[in-house]
């Protein structure tokens, strides 16, 4: 009799499990309005040091940037920051190789940033100051400017390559730099001076020299890291050659994130909404056969289309373009950030502009929307599953940010046993670099591990850094903008669903 009852109970359990296995559960989520730090996005902290007077980074100070919301410099608004912009001014090395001492100090900086849980936006330049001596330039910036010749720049990039490769995990993006004052590729002694002091245009030979520098920088980085150029025309001239026209085609979705040179070039605009063309950002600087001339509308269209698939950031530089650079309805600050897919801006400059966003009421939104901001809406999961069998699910999200993540990132569905805490991870196929602004419908089917034991499992989402050195550090994982989902200790996002797992005999 007991044996008969036992068999009945087993049959009952199997039937119930099979019913559960066929059921799908819908979970709905509540959006959070909180401002919180996330990797590789937001307002950055500016920092610079000269090779001739190297000031190293401070770990505790960097940790404070990430963990404590605070105001910086003349800013009226407080921020969390996971990004450090670091200027390395190679003032001692304009005509000679980088020293072993400088390279060691640079490597030490990388270690400090990694230990503090931040990432870096890096630019190298040779000169960050100007001289005026009555020259022709309307801005009063006069030659000699003080940057380095091509042979020296290429030598320095080769010296930097081992460190850039070694520390790519904490490099969010590298800016082209090197050429001209501030590394902005305009006022230069050696790469074609397009100002009134020079030819008033950039000749074909100078475009080729600039392209050689950009190519060397791309080669100095791993294929999974990108270089930002100062103007969209710089990318056109690199991709299509010195004679490229301003109506050259932007990158397509099919080419995006395929590790080619074209797919690894983004933009930094250091005069965001400073004028109708952002002080020459959207300009045609000419060639040997064409003059320098305005190209605002054409270059804006190119920038908007191409920037969907790469890193965009920069800073404001002048408040002369008010009210256009203000909050809506008088201005179009957020509209422009969305159209051009901004992931980051400078909190240190220019706060004459930035503070207006704070006083007018749109800074709170900008802080949350720079880069990505993923919000769970609802999800559909099986009530039960079996070891080794397919596990199909769907998740509906929204990206409320201006852009998608620009560096590759792992996505994991985590199953955590509710009793033992043991973790099983399902690597997912989705690429969140294509999770653009707006609604996202994500559907996948993954096989449950053969080794997963029967029991109840909590489901969680994890978006860890792709580098093993950072993948288990929660400060480098993406937090979703929902109430009651984030686990600060693990970097996981709770999906608020328990799934029953059976074995192959159930």
What are these regions (language model features)?
Residues 102-119, 142-173, 206-220:
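An active-site-proximal structural segment forming one wall of the substrate-binding cleft
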Residues 327-381:
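Catalytic cores of secreted or luminal carbohydrate-active enzymes
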Residues 46, 170-349:
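Catalytic-core regions of glycoside hydrolase
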Residues 1-23:
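Bacterial Sec-dependent N-terminal signal peptides
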Residues 65-131, 136, 152-153, 221, ...:
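Aromatic-lined substrate-binding rim segments of carbohydrate-active enzymes
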Residues 89-101, 139-151, 193-207:
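The substrate-binding groove and active-site-proximal loops of carbohydrate-active enzymes
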Residues 23-83, 87:
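Boundary/entry segment of secreted carbohydrate-active catalytic domains
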Residues 366-506:
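Extracellular/luminal regions of secreted and cell-surface proteins that mediate adhesion/ECM remodeling
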């Amino acid at each position: 009799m007991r044996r008969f009852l036992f068999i009945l109970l087993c049959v009952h359990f199997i039937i119930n499990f099979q019913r559960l296995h066929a059921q799908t559960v819908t979970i709905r989520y509540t959006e959070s309005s909180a401002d919180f730090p996330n990797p590789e996005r937001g307002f950055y902290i500016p920092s610079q040091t000269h090779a001739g007077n190297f000031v190293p980074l401070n770990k505790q100070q960097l940790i404070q940037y990430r963990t404590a919301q605070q105001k910086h410099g003349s800013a009226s608004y407080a921020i969390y920051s996971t990004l450090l912009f670091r200027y390395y001014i190679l003032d001692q090395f304009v005509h000679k190789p980088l020293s072993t001492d400088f390279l060691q100090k640079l490597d030490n900086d990388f270690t400090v940033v990694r230990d503090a849980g931040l990432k870096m936006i890096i630019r190298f330049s040779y000169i960050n100051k100007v001289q005026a001596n009555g020259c022709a330039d309307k801005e009063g910036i006069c030659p000699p400017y003080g940057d380095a010749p091509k042979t020296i720049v290429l030598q320095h990039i080769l010296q930097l390559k081992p460190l850039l490769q070694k520390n790519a995990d904490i490099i969010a993006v590298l800016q082209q730099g090197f050429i001209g004052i501030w590394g902005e590729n305009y006022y230069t002694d050696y790469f074609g001076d397009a100002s009134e002091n020079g030819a008033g245009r950039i000749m074909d030979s100078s475009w080729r020299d600039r392209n050689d520098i950009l190519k060397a920088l791309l080669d100095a980085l791993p294929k999974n890291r990108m270089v930002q150029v100062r103007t969209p025309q710089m990318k056109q001239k690199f991709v299509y050659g010195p004679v490229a026209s301003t109506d050259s085609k932007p990158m397509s979705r099919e080419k995006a994130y395929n590790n080619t040179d074209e797919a690894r070039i983004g933009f930094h605009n250091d005069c965001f909404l400073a004028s109708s063309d952002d002080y020459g950002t959207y300009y045609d600087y000419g060639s040997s056969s064409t003059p320098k001339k305005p190209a605002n509308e054409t270059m804006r269209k190119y920038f908007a289309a191409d920037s969907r698939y790469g890193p965009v950031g920069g800073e404001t530089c002048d408040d002369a373009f008010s009210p256009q650079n203000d909050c809506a309805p008088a201005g179009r600050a957020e509209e422009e950030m969305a159209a051009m897919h901004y992931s980051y801006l400078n909190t240190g400059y220019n706060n004459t502009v930035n503070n207006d966003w704070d006083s007018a009421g749109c800074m709170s939104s900008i802080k949350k929307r720079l880069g990505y901001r993923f919000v769970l809406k609802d999800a559909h999961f099986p009530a039960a599953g079996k070891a080794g069998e397919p596990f199909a699910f769907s998740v509906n999200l929204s990206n409320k940010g201006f852009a998608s993540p620009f560096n590759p990132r792992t996505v994991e569905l985590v199953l955590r046993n509710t009793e033992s805490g043991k973790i099983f991870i399902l690597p997912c196929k989705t690429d969140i670099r294509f999770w653009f602004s707006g609604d996202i419908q994500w559907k996948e089917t993954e096989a449950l591990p053969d080794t997963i034991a029967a029991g109840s499992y909590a489901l969680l989402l994890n978006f860890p850094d792709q580098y093993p050195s950072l993948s288990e550090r929660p400060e480098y994982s993406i937090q979703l903008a929902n109430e009651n989902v984030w686990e600060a200790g693990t970097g996981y996002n709770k999906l608020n669903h328990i799934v029953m797992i059976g074995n192959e005999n159930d």
